[in-house]
Amino acid sequence: GLELTIKKGELMAVIGKSGSGKSTLLNMIGGLERPTAGKLYVDGKDLFAMTDKELVEYRKHTVGFVWQKNSRNLLPYMTALENVQVPMYFDKDNKADREKKAYDLLCKVGLKEKVNSYPSQMSGGEQQRVAIAIALANDPKILLADEPTGAVDSKTSDMIQDLFRKLNEELGITVIIVTHD
């Protein structure tokens, strides 16, 4: 079993070997998986008691996901700006508002010059920063990152880790990163 308390605004890394349950933990916190036993409370809400509809709302507004594989984060036929807008289609009707927010998020992650680039025109690190902007699109309280630096070189890895620290400090967002190193 596991007993874990993560405070609001905390930056935390869960480190362990492959198969140790790191991604499963992240998926449970994200409302994507349910355990066979136990309890999980996020912001005072019992995730395991939520209906499917409540879980959808939780995932839309409480958590943002960054996956290791960029293919899970980005649509290849859309620009960075368009990709970041995708999660907003369900909540923001005004196209100008979506575009402005997406642009601002891309600037926040250091990609002002890549707003009109397609994923195939970006490096792995740039794609991962677009993925972080996507995860922030609906102002989540918690940012969940599953091996976010697993597919990039060490210099880019350091830059992405610094970005998570910056977002944690500037936005006060809780950041949970799982990694094997």
Segments predicted by a language model, with ranges:
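Short coil-to-helix segment of the ABC ATPase nucleotide-binding domain corresponding to the Q-loop/switch region
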Residues: Y77-Q85
